[in-house]
From Swiss-Prot:
Signal peptide region: 1-27
Subcellular compartments: Virion membrane
Pfam families: Marek_A
Subunit structure: Interacts with host complement component C3b; this interaction inhibits host immune response by disregulating complement cascade.
Protein name: Envelope glycoprotein C
Organism: Human herpesvirus 2 (strain HG52) (HHV-2)
Regions that span the bilayer: 448-468
Recorded name of the encoding gene: gC
Amino acid sequence: MALGRVGLAVGLWGLLWVGVVVVLANASPGRTITVGPRGNASNAAPSASPRNASAPRTTPTPPQPRKATKSKASTAKPAPPPKTGPPKTSSEPVRCNRHDPLARYGSRVQIRCRFPNSTRTEFRLQIWRYATATDAEIGTAPSLEEVMVNVSAPPGGQLVYDSAPNRTDPHVIWAEGAGPGASPRLYSVVGPLGRQRLIIEELTLETQGMYYWVWGRTDRPSAYGTWVRVRVFRPPSLTIHPHAVLEGQPFKATCTAATYYPGNRAEFVWFEDGRRVFDPAQIHTQTQENPDGFSTVSTVTSAAVGGQGPPRTFTCQLTWHRDSVSFSRRNASGTASVLPRPTITMEFTGDHAVCTAGCVPEGVTFAWFLGDDSSPAEKVAVASQTSCGRPGTATIRSTLPVSYEQTEYICRLAGYPDGIPVLEHHGSHQPPPRDPTERQVIRAVEGAGIGVAVLVAVVLAGTAVVYLTHASSVRYRRLR
């Protein structure tokens, strides 16, 4: 009986230690408690010896991976990392809404810039204008949107604005329409301090260019700088002028694309009665630069001549490239007119020269020239006679008294449209001999005139002598 109780007690005691080992193994996955010889816990057999059970040893082992379980802790998603946005505007020295604006000629342009670090007592802003991006004073074309540090305004610019005008160097050159007392004012800067708005009242070829914004503290006004480029564009105005031609002259028409900018490319395509003109010898195009932009003139000459068929209708198509990606296209049309070739005759009747021109348009008149004199002779009346049978034309006649000094006479028609060649008639006539009595009268008049002139000179000289003598005597009496 006693031995049975002892055995039962030893068995219960062993079971208790096995339970403790299992609990400790589950509670600490990083440590394994072994009983008896070294080895894995799964291979160690529990010993019933009280001596072995009373002296357990612990051996540290590397952590073992745990099997995945369906617990909530294992299925929870990790927290997302905090989002990092752009830096705050307060850390940026400037922020402009437009660094390369392109606007129409004559429009009003606004450029807004923010200066987060500015204060009312320390902030100073200057804006300078340069004609072009590659100005010799600037050097290479500056980078837009780049903020430069400790860079003063390059030489050669014109000052547009200074927030501290009392500190402006008196030797600076103000841009036209800027500075104290400018009228009319072309530039203005408005808005609260730190949020400045540059306003260009009228964008032209003179007000476009590179604008350099330089700012900083009052004692360090060139701390930062940035460039803004302002560009202007001006679409061309298109006009067509079909030339009036005389019978036998080739038809012509001229198209003009005027005052456009920039002058990249202005291309003309010509059509005559709906058919394109391909022969480059028939088209002459020339471009010139003016103070207000560029102008291109293109003239087409037809192979057909007036009077041998109906008048021709010309169409010019203009393609203007504003930049490398934008272009506009316009058309203009007109019909040429044909004028009859006039007949001009000259005759001398008595003491007059008579010039007659038939089939001239309304508004045409005469101009007379004598000898080598390039200036017209005295104005003479022009009489219009009957029509020559064509609508809008008439026969006109003019008379001119003959000259006693000249023998060559030119009768020229004036008032024809541009492009019509000079129409004139030349004639010769010997001046008639003068009447002897008339010559004597002329000589008598000339002699009388000379005598009167001499008499007037003598009277004036005598009066001067008398006046000087009287003045001298009066002065002598006063001295005595």
